[in-house]
A protein has these predicted regions:
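Short acidic/polar capping segments at secondary-structure boundaries
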Residues: 27, 55-58, 71-75, 88-90, ...
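Short, charged, surface-exposed secondary-structure boundary motifs
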Residues: 30-35, 76-78, 138
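ATP-grasp fold ATP-binding core
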Residues: 40, 61-79, 102-116
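Conserved metal-phosphate-binding beta-hairpin within the catalytic cores
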Residues: 167-192
Length: 192
């Protein structure tokens, strides 16, 4: 999926002129962390407990461990997504975001369970999923925090249903994402 702002602006312009754009520039904008979180929650897609805050504000919630993620963009560098186990770590991450000019953060509870990556096409039977731990599939190496997947049983059909629901809410018919399958088999989408 395109991420460069100039490329997205060009796609948006072409789309507005009537060109066929498979994953809409508007949908790509919806996948920026803050709007993505808001849309997934609004549309009832199973998602971690989340808080959206200004990086200038103090984090007052008691939700640890957690993930602190830049809210104004996709993760571009490793430091855009950080794991925190206490308030001091969250405050240090927010301070780093402020120094880098990042105005908003999304804080997600850390979900215990098996990390699953998936890819699909909304409205079709195409859906592929896998555990990233055995094949060392990683963007920034943070998947190791969830550890090696235990193979918790879950409904692939339900994950496909929820993924298609997310794709529709975000307006991205060709998609990929991450979820965590909890001990009871419930998948919750944490990235799309």
């Amino acid at each position: 999926m395109a991420r460069d702002k100039v490329t997205i602006a060009r796609l948006r312009s072409l789309e507005d002129e009537g060109a066929l754009v498979i994953n809409s520039a508007y949908g790509i904008d919806n996948c920026v962390r803050k709007p993505m979180t808001e849309l997934l929650i609004k549309n009832g897609v199973p998602h971690p407990q989340s808080f959206i805050i200004s990086t200038a504000d103090e984090y007052l919630e008691n939700c640890y461990p957690c993930w602190v993620k830049r809210g104004d963009s996709h993760a571009m560098v490793k430091e855009d997504v950080a794991y925190a186990t206490c308030k001091e770590e969250v405050e240090n991450i927010l301070a780093d975001f402020r120094k880098r000019g990042i105005p908003v953060a999304v804080i997600n509870e850390h979900l215990q369970g098996d990390l699953v990556k998936f890819y699909g096409v909304h409205g079709t039977d195409f859906f592929y999923w896998f555990y990233p731990s055995p094949c060392s599939h990683s963007k920034f190496g943070l998947e190791k925090i969830n550890g090696i997947a235990k193979g918790i049983p879950f409904s692939v059909e339900e994950l496909k249903i929820q993924s298609d629901k997310a794709a529709e809410a975000l307006n991205v018919p060709i998609y990929g994402g991450d979820c965590v399958v909890s001990a009871d088999g419930t998948p919750r989408i944490r990235d799309f």
